[in-house]
Amino acid sequence: TRAGLTNIHPERISSEHDSRIARLTGKADRVLVDAPCSGLGTLRRNPDLKYRQSPETVAKLLEQQHSILDAAAKLVKPQGRLVYATCSVLPEENEMQVERFLEEHPEYELLDCAELLAGLKIDLNTGKYLRLDSAKHQTDGFFAAVLRRR
């Protein structure tokens, strides 16, 4: 790879119902959930998006996100990490989704994104969660949480 890493085996799992989940249970060091979301963090580039989302469509997304996170959690081995990311600015899709996950999965803990980034010499000081704001960071709205399996 470009990064010079040779022990990476990416698996694109496009559904929480994928048959490979059973085979990969407890084997992944890192799992990225790029969750389907309302996309409301991209409003500056997609202003019509606000007319395509409704409380009903967001409610469906919330359940899908929950299901995907639940399935992804099974893939991570002890001390492995699960990253949950959206391009939404809605707390329901972000912090609240992660808090619900942590309540249902006591084997996981939330890592502090600001500390992780500081260790890489990136000073965003966003707190426990990585939350990018279009006004403050000159980018789309973005959210990420890093969870570690105990």
Describe the function of each predicted region.
Residues 1-150:
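S-adenosylmethionine
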